[in-house]
């Protein structure tokens, strides 16, 4: 029996990686993305991603679970298309939106850390029948503005209280919470009488909360 050895974890310290990045002198992009999907083997998924991304000098903090992936990353700009190809190997990430940071910091991440977790975003739900792939309708900006003008619409801000306090849409429900899992029972209670007769519109920072 042949045993194959694969590098599935970091071998460099953050300090060593920072020196390598500076010496390379190449522009890096900071980006984030997420996707909900039914992952049969999260550990294998994690290992496959590490091998593919380590080869592209991709760094970042990534969580994978049986419900999908949530990633914040730094990659060399010249490897962007190759990186996208590693995503599109998976049907659920074909055409995925990569959110690029407004300002790019070459040292935003100094290790490639991919962790297998129970969930990609903690929600406090213990419901095996909950289907993360059964999502609502994504609205473009024009559609969002139009539905906000409908008096039959209820708007929910799924961000933390310190974000909604800075600014939020008019008449939005803004739970006084610090975590997503805290907001769910509060919002569910407030909306229980309107689930069938109102337009329920939700927004959050990156989409991962309100999509769930």
Tell what function each PLM region has.
Residues 3-212:
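Cytosolic catalytic domains that perform sulfur/thiol-centered chemistry
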């Amino acid at each position: 029996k042949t045993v194959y050895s694969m590098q599935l974890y970091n071998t460099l310290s953050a300090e060593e990686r920072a020196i390598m990045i500076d010496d390379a002198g190449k522009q890096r992009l900071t980006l984030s993305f997420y996707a909900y999907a039914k992952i049969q083997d999260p550990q294998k998924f994690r290992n496959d991603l590490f091998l593919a991304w380590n080869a592209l000098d991709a760094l970042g903090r990534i969580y994978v679970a049986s419900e999908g992936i949530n990633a914040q990353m730094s990659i060399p700009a010249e490897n962007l298309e190759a990186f996208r190809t590693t995503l599109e190997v998976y049907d659920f990430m074909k055409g995925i939106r990569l959110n690029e940071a407004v300002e790019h910091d070459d040292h935003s991440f100094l290790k490639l850390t991919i962790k297998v977790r129970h969930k990609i975003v903690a929600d406090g739900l213990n419901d095996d029948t909950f289907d993360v792939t059964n999502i609502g309708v994504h609205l473009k900006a024009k559609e969002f503005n139009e539905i906000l003008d409908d008096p039959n619409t209820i708007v929910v801000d799924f961000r933390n209280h310190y974000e909604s306090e800075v600014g939020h849409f008019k008449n939005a429900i803004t739970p006084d919470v610090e975590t997503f899992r805290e907001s769910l029972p509060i919002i569910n209670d407030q909306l229980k009488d309107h689930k069938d007769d109102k337009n329920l519109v939700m927004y959050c920072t990156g989409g991962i909360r309100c999509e769930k």
